[in-house]
Amino acid sequence: MKGKSSVMEKLAEVVSLKLNKHLKMEGIELIKLKLGVEIIFINISKLAILFLVSYYFGLIKETIIMLAAFGFLRSNAFGLHAKNSIVCTVMSLLMFVLGAYLSKYLLFNNYMVLASFIIVNLLLFRYAPGDTEAHPLVGAKLRDKLKKQAVLMGMLLMAITLIIPDELIKTCISLSSYFEIISILPITYKVLGRRYKNYYEFERTIKQS
């Protein structure tokens, strides 16, 4: 993975330097530009791996649906991130390729969808949004706003899933919603040895300074 990271770093440096001929950035701003470009390239490479594997197994449609549903909820509920690119890629394959494969055999009907989303929305109301050490969600107003929006997104996704006639799509969306919920549960933080409610530490530091 060091070789891959080195390639990404070099590629990001080349692209950022070319961009900087027009942007004229210096110092910390140039470093931020390079890091931003590198993150984009890393995410593109992870998506490419995900789509290639799902295409190989004939699951591309299901994988895209699961990614879209997951991203829809995560945009406001947030949640844990993997600590490195390899773990992130492996977890993505497990969730969105293996999950897509399992969806073909589980096949949720509307009763199962309704029961699933009642649980999902209750857990969103209780635990969303989930933050990380690198991205603490500072401010009670912000967290309250994100919580309300996350529940609203959950309700909207439930309505869409109930309306969709295809049981395979219903199952893909439901499983993706479970995966997002898992990423915000306190037990998940505890099992993975990650700090929960990171904004506490951040806000306490601000008050002490």
From Swiss-Prot:
Top EC group = hydrolase
Q: Where are the transmembrane segments?
A: 49-71, 82-102, 105-125, 149-169, 173-193
Coiled coil regions, renumbered to chain: none
A single cellular component GO annotation: plasma membrane
**GO annotation terms (biological process):** proteolysis; quorum sensing
Q: Which compartments is it annotated to reside in? A: Cell membrane
Sorted alphabetically, the keyword list is: Cell membrane, Hydrolase, Membrane, Protease, Quorum sensing, Transmembrane, Transmembrane helix
Q: Topology relative to the membrane, per the entry?
A: Multi-pass membrane protein
| Pfam families referenced in this protein's UniProt entry, alphabetically | AgrB (PF04647)
Q: Which GO terms describe its molecular function?
A: peptidase activity
Q: Which InterPro entries match?
A: AgrB (IPR006741)
Enzyme Commission number(s) of this protein: 3.4.-.-
- Primary subcellular site in the record, as a coarse category: membrane
Domain of life assignment: Bacteria
Report the HAMAP family cross-referenced here.
AgrB
Cited function: May be involved in the proteolytic processing of a quorum sensing system signal molecule precursor.
Family classification: Belongs to the AgrB family.
Q: What is this protein called?
A: Putative AgrB-like protein
